[in-house]
């Protein structure tokens, strides 16, 4: 068994102009998980984000949506993790993933940042540790590098958003395995899903 997850972070950019953009897929996941748990995210300036907690099998699980911009996501993640003494190996970061098509989602542990500025900052703010879990939410690639920024900062089509939402629903359904530290089960179940 791997370490159980105690902090779940949803990456995105703050503000109404970004809330429906592909780059906020991680936020969509945390919002969906909060709804399923019946909790509400509220602003907590001490942690530079929106936070909530819920109980799972006697353990406190913390949710965080940084209200910093994407490239400063580590500021919020480190502030909360350090205060509650949550090791990096017990953090799950949900983020948009260019290398997966809409409708696909994958759990994994460790790895690089793959050019994702939110992951880059989290790695940097946690002593260059890459050992946190990731939930990679497919948003598709626009085809060329010069189109990546406009792609991630734009809204997906209705069809793509429906696929992303279905993948998020499946990820939420499989989050319990991550909270128990059963990465293999979570990966196997989610990797077998295709919206």
Curated annotation (Swiss-Prot):
Molecular function terms, GO-annotated: peptidyl-tRNA hydrolase activity; tRNA binding
Binding, tRNA: 18, 69, 71, 117
Location(s), subcellular: Cytoplasm
Pfam family name, one: Pept_tRNA_hydro
Keywords assigned: Cytoplasm, Hydrolase, RNA-binding, tRNA-binding
Main location: cytoplasm
Reactions that this protein is recorded to catalyse: an N-acyl-L-alpha-aminoacyl-tRNA + H2O = an N-acyl-L-amino acid + a tRNA + H(+)
GO-annotated cellular components: cytoplasm
InterPro entries with a match to the protein in the record: Pept_tRNA_hydro, Pept_tRNA_hydro_CS, Pept_tRNA_hydro_sf
Domain of life of the native organism: Bacteria
Catalytic-site annotation from UniProt: 23
EC number: 3.1.1.29
Site-annotated residues for Stabilizes the basic form of H active site to accept a proton: 96
GO process terms (BP): protein quality control for misfolded or incompletely synthesized proteins; rescue of stalled ribosome
UniProt subunit comment: Monomer.
Function: Hydrolyzes ribosome-free peptidyl-tRNAs (with 1 or more amino acids incorporated), which drop off the ribosome during protein synthesis, or as a result of ribosome stalling. Catalyzes the release of premature peptidyl moieties from peptidyl-tRNA molecules trapped in stalled 50S ribosomal subunits, and thus maintains levels of free tRNAs and 50S ribosomes.
Family statement: Belongs to the PTH family.
Protein's name in the database: Peptidyl-tRNA hydrolase
Gene that encodes it: pth
């Amino acid at each position: 068994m791997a370490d159980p997850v105690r902090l779940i972070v949803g990456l995105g950019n703050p503000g109404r102009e970004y809330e429906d953009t592909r780059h906020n897929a991680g936020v969509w996941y945390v919002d969906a998980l909060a709804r399923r748990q019946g909790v509400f995210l509220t602003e907590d300036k001490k942690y530079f984000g929106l936070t909530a907690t819920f109980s799972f099998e006697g353990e406190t699980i913390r949710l965080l949506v940084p209200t910093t911009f994407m490239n400063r996501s580590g500021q919020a993640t480190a502030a909360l993790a350090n205060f509650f003494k949550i090791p990096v190996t017990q953090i799950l970061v949900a983020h948009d993933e260019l290398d997966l098509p809409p409708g696909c989602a994958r759990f994994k542990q460790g790895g690089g940042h793959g050019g994702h500025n939110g992951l880059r900052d989290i790695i940097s703010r946690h002593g260059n540790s890459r050992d946190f879990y990731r939930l990679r939410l497919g948003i598709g690639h626009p085809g060329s590098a010069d189109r990546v920024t406009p792609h991630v900062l734009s809204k997906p089509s209705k069809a793509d958003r429906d696929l992303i939402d279905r993948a998020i629903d499946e990820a939420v359904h499989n989050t319990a395995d991550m909270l128990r530290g059963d990465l293999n089960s979570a990966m196997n179940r989610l990797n077998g899903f295709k919206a």
